[in-house]
Amino acid sequence: MTEQMLDYFIVGAGLGGVAFAEVALQHQKSIFVFAGDKPPSSVAAAGVYNAVILKRFTLVSQAQEQINLLKVFYPEIEKRIQKNIIFDLPTYRRLASVEEQNNFIVASDRPLFQLFLSPKIISDKFKAVISPFGFGLMKQTGYVDTKLLLQSYRNYLQQNGCISAETFNYAELIIHPDFVEYKGQKAKQIIFAEGFQMKHNPFFKDLPLEGAKGELLVIRSENLDVNVLLKAGVFVLPIGNDLYKVGATYNWTDKTNKPTQSAKDELISELKELISCDFEVVEHLAGIRPTVKDRKPLVGRHPFHKNIYLLNGLGTRGVMLAPYLSYKLFDFIESDLPLDSSISIERYYNSITSSNK
């Protein structure tokens, strides 16, 4: 770190922290990132993006805006880190019955869904995929290689002397009226983007971050030969060299990052209902998604400290939300543009205030 006053401290180097760092750098702001010694859940994420919640045939809020943004945002990061990290890939939703075929066609005909769902049922047969009722085509989908993104971005920050692997010690943060100070270094603002580690943050630990453990497998199969993202009971994401990511599980009680045999068995069982060829498991990953009770993000300013901010609650759609929320938070801080009430942490602080009246 330097002796000069920085614009931002950023605590956390997962998708949220890296996205906010990128937004700040795009605006010529000075930053320092505290990465910590625990791997973020983003490393174990599939990094898939799509606009439709298939279980209920609903659109993600601000879906098109988020898709448009990520298609510009991640290529900008690619230029910075000199790596390919974002890949467009159509999604084939396996249909399990005639009723599911009809539901998909009806949904695709609704005006809001026409940009994201195709009305034609795809009967292309992948030899090793069990699909007697065909597939529904989802458009504007793909994935970001989150592991490569986070590793490469961390290397970039390291080369520029603006990241530390140390775990942030909250007790050493000194809060002044117009800046914060940490171990002698000063910054105008501090952004906490710690994912599930927020549960240990004394400034925000009372917010309702629950955390949902997710596990996925990486398999190798020479005979699967699939070049789209398959979605059924599990998703199957081709990542090259006969390798595929398979996921993902949800566990609301286990808050460890350790892979479990039960999740592995569950994923393998689901996979065998989707494909008929041999495969081998080459990797098993686990992480805690930063999920919130109301399924909405946690973004905004601390109610008592005007230079302390939160960027969290990205949940299962971190690849889409990280750029979108980072720009929203940056504009809130720098230009005083209000945050939407659905993402602002004020929705919780206001409810606490109201209940105490």
UniProtKB/Swiss-Prot annotation:
Localization, UniProt: Cytoplasm; Secreted, Cell wall
Regulation: Activated by manganese, copper, and iron ions. Inhibited by barium, aluminum, and zinc ions.
Coiled-coil segments on the chain, per record: none
Database matches in Pfam families: DAO
Chain sites annotated for binding D-serine: R289
Residues at which D-proline binds: R289
Function: Catalyzes the oxidative deamination of D-amino acids with broad substrate specificity.
Protein name per the record: D-amino-acid oxidase
